[in-house]
């Protein structure tokens, strides 16, 4: 799919139902597609290795792609170059497969003048220093940048209960306390299921 909508300056059609589960190359896909701003949040990009220049000059694009599985991405060079409207929180993306030898993250947010979300939790252990032009012209300051050469540990959750004998009777109340190892953004959702209960 590399370059499929490149230079399509009027294109702004829905692509929500596209099956992208076997796609490996999305490089330059929306390069210079200056009108495109559609919901592609549900795309399966888990096999995509090439994302370089994907949204270059896609000046209208500001769709939420925060839940994309980018764990296979190796090359995100200039991905949002001059994507001047883009400002979605992609701080939880997995970029651990990128490295300088594969193009990596050079110029990723260069000229993305609206982008302001922190990416400090990114795992960038393959980079000994900041890639060239990584955030030039964006709103990313030092406090929002990754710690180059480091893969931060993920937040942990510890759940404790007031039930000391591990026996819960029908209709009884159980007090559960959840402690996160770091501040959570928004409201975390915790689902507790039961199993192995005898009637």
Please place each PLM-identified region on the residue numbering.
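Negatively charged
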Residues: 2-154
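Generic beta-strand hydrophobic packing signal
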Residues: 127, 162, 187-190
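Cys/His-enriched low-complexity segments
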Residues: 134-135, 166-168, 180
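Serine/threonine-rich, repeat-prone extracellular segments and beta-strand-based repeat modules
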Residues: 147-150, 164, 196
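Short, solvent-exposed loop/edge segments of extracellular or virion-exposed proteins
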Residues: 155-169
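Short, surface-exposed alpha-helix to beta-strand junction/turn motifs within ectodomains of secreted
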Residues: 174-199
């Amino acid at each position: 799919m590399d370059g499929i909508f490149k230079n399509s300056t009027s294109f702004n059609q829905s692509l929500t139902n596209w099956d992208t589960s076997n796609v490996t190359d999305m490089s330059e896909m929306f390069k210079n597609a200056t009108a495109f701003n559609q919901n592609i949040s549900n795309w399966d990009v888990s096999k995509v290795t090439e994302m370089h220049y994907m949204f270059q000059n896609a000046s209208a694009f500001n769709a939420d792609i925060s839940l994309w599985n980018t764990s296979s991405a190796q090359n995100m060079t200039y991905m949002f170059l001059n994507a001047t409207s883009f400002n979605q929180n992609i701080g939880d993306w997995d970029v651990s497969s990128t490295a300088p030898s594969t193009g990596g993250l050079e110029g990723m947010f260069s000229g993305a003048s609206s982008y302001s979300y922190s990416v400090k939790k990114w795992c960038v252990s393959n980079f000994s220093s900041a890639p060239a032009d990584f955030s030039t012209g964006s709103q990313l300051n030092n406090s929002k940048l990754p710690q180059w050469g480091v893969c931060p540990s993920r937040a942990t959750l510890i759940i404790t209960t007031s039930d000391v004998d591990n026996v819960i009777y029908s209709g009884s109340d159980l007090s559960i306390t959840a402690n996160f190892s770091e501040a959570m953004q928004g409201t975390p959702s915790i689902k507790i299921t039961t199993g192995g209960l005898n009637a």
